[in-house]
């Protein structure tokens, strides 16, 4: 019996969960691990929500699952997402000789908020640097899930890093 910090009742089923459960994909060594959880039975299928059209997809093993989602631009492996974000942070920050503060809680949260991380370097008007850095930092980290950037004197800059979910293919993000 798992208890979520915040959960909701979905549909007419007697189950509280963080998100709606539609299926349980459970395969190991190319075999379905059969079990029931409330109103659901495990199988080798799941529902894919693509362009607001729900489709049932079957998988023979984890490799086929991971391959399918990779083609969709989704990194299933949390460690791969984490390493990609770290690598991009380092690349951007080392070019500018700047840094971010260690905030593993925020970093772990962001790793789990995205499927296909896209790191963006953003900035705000320098006039807002008159606001105490503690307030700027708290606001960016707690409310916006951004990573404020600091110079080598430990002063906050008007730049910050964000981790977006997927690349902006249509050019809608203006930085």
Residue ranges and their predicted role:
Residues 161-169:
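Short beta-strand-to-loop transition segments that serve as allosteric relay/switch motifs
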Residues 1-145, 150-154, 166-167:
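Long, basic N-terminal domains or extensions that often function
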Residues 173-175:
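Switch/coupling subdomain of P-loop NTPase systems
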Residues 156-158:
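Elongated, amphipathic alpha-helical interaction scaffolds
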């Amino acid at each position: 019996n798992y208890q979520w910090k915040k959960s909701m009742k979905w549909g007419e089923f007697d189950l509280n969960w963080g998100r709606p459960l539609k299926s349980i994909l459970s395969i190991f060594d190319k075999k379905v691990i059969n079990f029931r959880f409330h109103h659901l039975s495990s199988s080798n299928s799941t529902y894919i929500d693509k362009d607001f059209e729900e489709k049932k997809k079957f998988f023979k093993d984890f490799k086929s699952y991971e391959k399918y989602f990779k083609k969709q631009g989704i990194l299933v492996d949390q460690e791969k997402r984490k390493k990609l974000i770290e690598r991009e942070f380092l690349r951007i920050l080392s070019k500018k000789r700047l840094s971010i503060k260690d905030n593993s809680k925020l970093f772990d949260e962001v790793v789990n908020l995205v499927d296909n991380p896209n790191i963006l370097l953003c900035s705000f008007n320098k006039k807002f640097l008159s606001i105490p850095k503690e307030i700027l930092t708290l606001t960016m980290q707690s409310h916006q899930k951004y990573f404020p950037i600091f110079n080598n004197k430990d002063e906050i800059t008007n730049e910050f890093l964000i981790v977006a979910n997927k690349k902006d293919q249509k050019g809608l993000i203006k930085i």
